Curated annotation (Swiss-Prot):
Together with its co-chaperonin GroES, plays an essential role in assisting protein folding. The GroEL-GroES system forms a nano-cage that allows encapsulation of the non-native substrate proteins and provides a physical environment optimized to promote and accelerate protein folding. CDD domains: GroEL. This is Chaperonin GroEL. Transmembrane segments: none annotated. Forms a cylinder of 14 subunits composed of two heptameric rings stacked back-to-back. Interacts with the co-chaperonin GroES. GO terms for molecular function: ATP binding; ATP-dependent protein folding chaperone; isomerase activity; unfolded protein binding. InterPro entries: Chaperonin_Cpn60_CS (IPR018370), Cpn60/GroEL (IPR001844), Cpn60/GroEL/TCP-1 (IPR002423), GroEL-like_apical_dom_sf (IPR027409), GROEL-like_equatorial_sf (IPR027413), TCP-1-like_intermed_sf (IPR027410). Its EC number is 5.6.1.7. HAMAP family: CH60 (MF_00600). GO terms for biological process: protein refolding. It catalyses: ATP + H2O + a folded polypeptide = ADP + phosphate + an unfolded polypeptide.
Length: 538
């Protein structure tokens, strides 16, 4: 396939045009008075959104050279979104400001490599300053604030705060469609997995068709149980305690199942058998999770634990177990809290290491079940377009809130980035030459988001910045929604520190790459051959 090439200044200018086209479409959405963008879809109704990453992802430019620049900005937005769940528009505005200023200097003869070095040093200092300005979330009210700002809705903020309140910081919160017009939170307490009773004869509540076991002993094994002989010793021990028994195994059939059912029907031993959740390696991990949660052991050949040798101490315990046709919920597991914490930390480490999205989701789900429950936010709306938009806002707000819990909050409205210039200012005294110019590029760009927020709300950005910098209070800023100045923390205008940090780091990374680009290579578009027309006599 033949290629087209562009070199030096011509290449960089083409990239800049692509960057500007995407950034100009995205930056009008920044701040409380940002506008919406309507995106045509090849199927279904158009999408109305003010989410930076959604807009950027939809843009594909006709000019292949410009499109390379557009793709780089998309990368800034999606990388920030993946890491922090928000701040995509801020990242785009920062990237555009750094690229514009940087290209001016490269055209004037500055060394791109030294510029990049200066940019990296300045960003490092600014990030340190952001960390200093951050403070930990103090409770439910702060969580509601962060979520409300991200979603642009106090109601959504309250829903997310309620969900987090119930499942804790590590709990899983999922977003699903509601069957009604209402948006509400549904909560599943304890550990739940998608496996029900093997036989309906185990049912204790005929009306609800479910098994309820109070304070049961829990036998956990990764084997298939068919013969009854290995089970007899432990069944006798459990029967003597008068407590019910839950058996979780790869499968229970034949003699083993018959014995459990008969004992239940005779009233000798109330019990229930369910299949183990998951498959393969995931099944082993989930059985181990259940064992740690309930304080039991997995009877497994791999671990050298035989069914015949099991004692009552090897069985798990819980306050209550509910088993339906296709789900089991274990409430109030009696496992050692320290062991549970260690297991959660282990799963957290695995989440950070994995690159697979599916793997990440299953690990997060496992972690939530250990942490104490799953909350589902059911989203309702009158139309499909509204539902899509609302669901998207809730998912974004959820990610931003998690980021805030992780690294704390900073004053919002672009104030933190503006205040972090102080650290870059000190750095400028230490640098010289093109490195100093690189740091100045970052210094200038740090005021771009607040200027854009002010302009979107109809104010003069330069005047707003001057007034903010006249105050010594690091949290003093401008409320663009009401047109007032004041302490951003007191006004509830806050951002997750992780969002602000990620936006700056990702913008600088792409800007540095673009400034050091000398050649663009794209595929030459194929010329469409005209279809020959048929002779007239046909």
């Amino acid at each position: 396939m033949p290629k087209l090439l562009k070199f030096n200044e011509e290449a960089r200018r083409a990239l800049e045009r692509g960057v500007d086209k995407v950034a100009n479409a995205v930056k009008i959405t920044l701040g409380p008075k940002g506008r919406n963008v309507v995106i045509e879809k090849s199927w279904g109704s158009p999408t109305i959104t003010n989410d930076g990453v959604s807009i950027a992802k939809e843009i594909e430019l006709e000019d292949k050279f410009e499109n390379l620049g557009a793709q780089l900005v998309k990368e800034v937005a999606s990388k920030t979104n993946d890491v922090a769940g928000d701040g995509t528009t801020t990242a785009t505005v920062l990237a555009q400001a750094m690229i514009k200023e940087g290209l001016k200097n490269v055209a004037a003869g500055a060394n791109p490599i030294l510029l990049k070095r200066g940019i990296d040093k300045a960003v490092e200092r600014a990030v340190e300053e952001i960390k200093k300005l951050s403070k930990k979330l103090s409770g439910r009210e702060d969580i509601a604030h962060v979520a409300a700002i991200s979603a642009n809705s106090p109601e959504i903020g309250e829903l997310i705060a309620e969900a987090m309140d119930k499942v804790g910081e590590d709990g899983v919160i999922t977003v699903e469609d509601s069957k009604t017009l209402e948006t509400y939170v549904e909560f599943t307490e304890g550990m739940q997995f998608d496996r029900g009773y093997i036989s309906p004869y185990f049912v204790t509540d005929a009306e609800k068709m479910e098994v309820v076991l109070k304070e049961p002993s829990i036998l956990i094994t990764d084997r298939k149980l068919s013969a009854v002989k290995p089970l007899i010793p432990i069944l006798e021990k459990v029967a003597q305690t008068g407590k019910p028994l839950l058996v979780i195994a790869e499968d229970v059939e034949g003699e083993a199942l018959t014995t459990l059912v008969l004992n239940k029907l005779k009233g000798t031993l109330q019990s229930c058998a369910v299949k183990a959740p998951g498959f393969g390696e995931r099944r082993k991990a989930m059985l181990q999770d259940i064992a740690i949660l309930t304080g039991g052991q997995v009877a497994s050949e791999e671990l050298g634990i035989n069914l015949e040798d099991l004692t009552l101490e090897d069985l798990g315990r819980a306050d209550l177990v509910r088993v339906k046709k296709d789900e089991t919920i274990i409430i109030g597991g009696k496992g050692d809290p320290e062991a549970i914490k260690k297991r959660i930390a282990q799963i957290k480490a695995q989440i950070e290491e994995t690159t697979s999205e599916y793997e990440k989701e299953t690990l997060q789900e496992r972690m939530a079940k250990l942490a104490g429950g799953v909350a589902v936010i059911k989203v309702g709306a009158a139309t499909e377009t509204e539902l899509k938009e609302k669901k998207h806002r809730i998912e974004d707000a959820l990610s931003a809130t998690r980021a805030a819990v992780e690294e704390g909050i900073v004053p919002g409205g672009g104030v933190t980035l503006l205040r972090s210039r102080k650290a870059v200012e000190k750095l400028l005294e230490e640098l010289d030459g093109d490195e100093k110019i690189g740091a100045q590029i970052v210094y200038k760009a740090l005021s771009a988001p607040i200027r854009q927020i002010a302009e979107n709300a109809g104010y003069d950005g330069a005047v707003i910045i001057e007034k903010i910098l006249a105050s010594d209070d690091p949290a003093y800023g401008f409320d663009a929604l009401r047109g007032e100045f004041g302490n951003m923390f007191e006004k509830g205008i806050i951002d997750p520190a992780k969002v602000t940090r990620s936006a700056l780091q990702n913008a600088a990374s792409i800007a540095g790459m673009l400034l050091t680009t000398e050649v663009l290579v794209v595929e030459k578009p194929e010329e469409k051959k005209e279809t020959p027309s048929l002779p007239e006599e046909y």
